[in-house]
Design a protein with these regions (language model features):
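Active-site gating/metal-coordination segments in enzymes
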Residues: 28, 34, 99-100, 107-210, ...
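Histidine-centered divalent metal-coordination motifs
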Residues: 44-53, 198, 235
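Active-site neighborhood of phospho(di)ester-bond hydrolases with catalytic His/Asp-centered motifs
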Residues: 43-46, 104, 134-136, 166, ...
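Mid-to-C-terminal alpha-helical segments outside catalytic/metal-binding sites
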Residues: 4-10, 23-44, 55-95, 99-100, ...
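Active-site environment of divalent metal-dependent phosphoester hydrolases
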Residues: 51-54, 108-111, 140-142, 173, ...
Length: 343
């Protein structure tokens, strides 16, 4: 009986999720931002994903489908597909009262799949005031087509709504200390496009777990060689595989040594990471690095995630005695200053 009720509950939840994804966008006069102690914070979520079900790898589809009962997994193509379009992303941002967000292209054919630069451009073109693009580059045949990939990357970054670059070394099977990819960092510096670098482990299939792929200390020589490039250490070294702050010390050390190093806390506001979030925020504050952290969620993932991630993050900041000014810096102005945006 319990299993039967559980299936009914899960089925209801799945149906609710499908309805949630397909709710209409909120009115154009929607009020965005948070009000903390009477002051407004115009939150920016720099870490959002787009894509399609068909472009995901089969192992990743299986992992993603674990969220719903087996007899409803046929719905995942439609559920996920609508959620990762620009319309789906904007709905989740609206629910969280987030006006602006960064959206990533992804080239991880061995782990999660592909959301190409061209697809990303299609999704964000009609929303330049709200969706900011982070281009990526395919690296799996780098020894053969590296120069062509760099040329394409530079061309894509010529679009005004492409504000940065995203790399995921553990997903793309790239060591942090591999000098073959210096061309990517050179382009980032020359074009003044900050580069987001995934650090820490991932629970997704076939991602690398060895330190040279996940510990940002292996990136230090690259940072030294490219002082004009702004590096954002994604996930702040969060060890999602072990649910621990395993590589945060490396991130802290790099941010303290180099003015061109920032951190992003994507996924640390997820339910899974609740036990380490407060510790993370305490460490950031104790090391006087609030001005080096740029908020991101790693959303939208599933209906309500973008909002719940932000809610947990804000609650944890308040519990950690962050001032309103510190919260505004982390949630809004650090991004605006680094990316030279006008509010």
């Amino acid at each position: 009986m319990g299993k039967f009720l559980s299936k009914i509950q899960l089925s209801t939840l799945t149906c609710f999720a499908m309805i949630f994804w397909n709710e209409p966008l909120l009115a154009e006069d929607q009020d965005y931002g948070l009000t903390i102690q009477g002051e407004s914070i115009d939150v920016i979520d720099m870490h959002l994903h787009t894509g399609t079900w068909d472009a995901l790898t089969e192992p990743y589809k299986e992992r993603y489908s674990e969220r719903v009962p087996k007899f409803l997994r046929f719905t995942m193509k439609y559920l996920l597909g609508s959620g990762l379009t620009s319309e789906g992303i904007l709905k989740q941002m609206d629910k969280a009262k987030i006006r602006r967000g960064g959206v990533f292209a992804v080239y991880s054919p061995d782990t999660t799949g592909i959301a190409s630069n061209q697809f990303l451009q299609q999704q964000i073109n009609d929303h330049p005031e709200r969706l900011l693009g982070f281009a990526s580059v395919r690296t799996d045949y780098w020894n053969i087509d590296g120069p062509e990939q760099l040329k394409e990357l530079e061309s894509v970054l010529g679009n005004s709504n492409m504000v940065g670059i995203k790399l995921a070394h553990a997903h793309q099977q790239m060591r942090f200390d591999d000098p073959r990819f210096d061309g990517v960092y050179e382009i980032a510096g020359r074009l003044e496009k900050p580069i987001y670098v995934h650090t820490g482990t991932s629970p997704n299939p076939y991602t690398r777990l060895e330190p040279p792929y996940v510990d940002p200390k292996y990136l230090e020589d690259t940072i030294q060689r490219h002082p004009d490039t702004q590096f954002i250490l994604g996930h702040s070294g969060y060890d999602s595989f072990k649910v621990a702050l395993t590589y945060l010390d490396s991130c802290i050390e790099l941010a303290q040594k180099y003015e061109n190093v920032y951190m992003e806390p994507g996924a640390l506001g997820a339910r899974k990471a609740e036990k380490v979030l407060t510790e993370y925020l305490r460490i950031i504050k104790e090391n006087n690095l609030v001005d080096r952290v740029i908020y991101g969620s790693d959303g939208p993932q599933f209906p309500g995630y973008t909002n719940s991630h932000l809610e947990r993050f804000v609650e944890a900041m308040q519990a950690s005695d962050y001032s309103t000014a510190e919260m505004r810096a982390l949630l809004q102005t650090n991004f605006e200053q680094l990316f030279k945006l006008q509010n």
